[in-house]
């Protein structure tokens, strides 16, 4: 039960996250998930295990408002998909055209909430519990 996490370039502290991103106009959630995964990690070979029901929302802390996303947004409403990676680790490349990550690793699902930034902790707690119910 390993999950992919990566350390963001814009946060030099030891905080990790799973790939995520926005939905372009006219794009559905699943298409956006595939696109963001490939843009951030070069990963193409995946299968969908399950779409997580509902959305999970977080807001940026006050000290980051106006800094992150050029002040355009104050948080995110996220739609998550559980995917199984079907490729080899050698296919993973975070040195993309617009790199977002410094490094990546596989971690145990149970460790997920130990490595994320505080303001996203509730997102990853909820996500971890939903994933556990689906894969067990």
Language-model regions: role of each:
Residues 19-23:
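Short helix/strand-bridging catalytic loops that position acidic/His residues to coordinate divalent metals
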């Amino acid at each position: 039960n390993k999950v992919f996490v990566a350390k963001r370039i814009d946060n030099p502290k030891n905080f990790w996250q799973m790939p995520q991103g926005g939905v372009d106009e006219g794009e559905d959630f699943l298409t956006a998930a595939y696109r963001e995964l490939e843009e951030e990690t070069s990963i193409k070979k995946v299968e969908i295990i399950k779409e997580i029901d509902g959305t999970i929302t977080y807001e940026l802390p006050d000290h980051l408002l106006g800094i992150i996303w050029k002040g355009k947004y104050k948080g995110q409403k996220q739609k998550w998909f559980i995917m199984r990676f079907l490729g080899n680790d050698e296919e993973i490349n975070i040195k993309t055209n617009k790199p977002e990550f410094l490094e990546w690793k596989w971690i145990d699902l149970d460790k997920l909430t130990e490595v994320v930034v505080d303001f996203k902790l509730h997102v990853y707690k909820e996500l971890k519990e939903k994933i556990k119910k689906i894969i067990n």
